[in-house]
Amino acid sequence: MEQTWRWYGPNDPVSLADVRQAGATGVVTALHHIPNGEVWSVEEILKRKAIVEDAGLVWSVVESVPIHEDIKTHTGNYEQWIANYQQTLRNLAQCGIRTVCYNFMPVLDWTRTDLEYVLPDGSKALRFDQIEFAAFEMHILKRPGAEADYTEEEIAQAAVRFATMSDEDKARLTRNIIAGLPGAEEGYTLDQFRKHLELYKDIDKAKLRENFAVFLKAIIPVAEEVGVRMAVHPDDPPRPILGLPRIVSTIEDMQWMVDTVNSMANGFTMCTGSYGVRADNDLVDMIKQFGPRIYFTHLRSTMREDNPKTFHEAAHLNGDVDMYEVVKAIVEEEHRRKAEGKEDLIPMRPDHGHQMLDDLKKKTNPGYSAIGRLKGLAEVRGVELAIQRAFFSR
């Protein structure tokens, strides 16, 4: 695997020198300063590429080129936003950057309720608490019909939880959910959030798939033409939330994408932490079935709790993800490609490390502190080395 590291640009508290010292050779980044929907110019792409290369690294993957909400709702200026996206892909290819991670999650990108969940060893992790999320949705957001998405027990627990929250607790929970986590390109006030949800009131799973198909049929031929590999990121968490449909959550969703636009430019990001939240997702089977189309991997693990919809970020080699079998399947896919004369490694980045050690004293991007990811990268690197030596050494 190509060892990469997500970097949020010049304002990231983790420097490119840190990235290189961590042992990564590739950088995963994006032009976050460009508004959603606008074209990434060749000039801006080359500026960022030069910064990365001057540090002795390579810009391996774009994460992400965000998709404008008009495209997802098939309203407004969506045709222009699609044309802009096509041009951005052409410009990236012209600059030699050919792997693009993206997602089709409506309104919200990845979502957590607690950004400082304290683990038994004193380190901090990200957590999604189903009951706190229900309390937010029913008692703070007050979304009409929200009760239909929860069990009677969850509704009762959410009411109790909300009653014990201080004003500060409510503000923090609201901020965690709607203000935008690292990599998310949209942040909202509560009123803005309600208005954006309203835009989806008539969009169910079938309709969102229809809108996604319009996007894929416009974008994938351009990607194929210029040699760019599109790698869709799964929903996080991988299930409907806030009354919004989610359409990249299961192996059936992956098959739908391939059936909709059967091009090798139409591929996947294997995010083990996102897919792995669902107990019914067999990650190794997903890799084996869609291996030739996996162009990027996020390796992390989550741990489901007593309520199976509640989870926290586990250490990379612990939790519900069998990281050994996952890495073995990825390495096997790389060797399959090599046998076909393809030498390209699959970029991998350690995802969502714990905040630990000296980073506990620093202001960090939630999930993206240096030391936790350094630990995760070292652990995954060790797993891969053992697999390569045991099964593929000559």
Swiss-Prot record:
<comment type="function">
    <text>Catalyzes the dehydration of D-mannonate.</text>
</comment>
<keyword id="KW-0456">Lyase</keyword>
<dbReference type="InterPro" id="IPR004628">
    <property type="entry name" value="Man_deHydtase"/>
</dbReference>
<dbReference type="Pfam" id="PF03786">
    <property type="entry name" value="UxuA"/>
</dbReference>
<dbReference type="GO" id="GO:0008927">
    <property type="term" value="F:mannonate dehydratase activity"/>
</dbReference>
<keyword id="KW-0464">Manganese</keyword>
<protein>
    <recommendedName>
        <fullName>Mannonate dehydratase</fullName>
        <ecNumber>4.2.1.8</ecNumber>
    </recommendedName>
</protein>
<keyword id="KW-0408">Iron</keyword>
<dbReference type="GO" id="GO:0042840">
    <property type="term" value="P:D-glucuronate catabolic process"/>
</dbReference>
<dbReference type="GO" id="GO:0008198">
    <property type="term" value="F:ferrous iron binding"/>
</dbReference>
<dbReference type="InterPro" id="IPR036237">
    <property type="entry name" value="Xyl_isomerase-like_sf"/>
</dbReference>
<dbReference type="GO" id="GO:0030145">
    <property type="term" value="F:manganese ion binding"/>
</dbReference>
<comment type="pathway">
    <text>Carbohydrate metabolism; pentose and glucuronate interconversion.</text>
</comment>
<comment type="similarity">
    <text>Belongs to the mannonate dehydratase family.</text>
</comment>
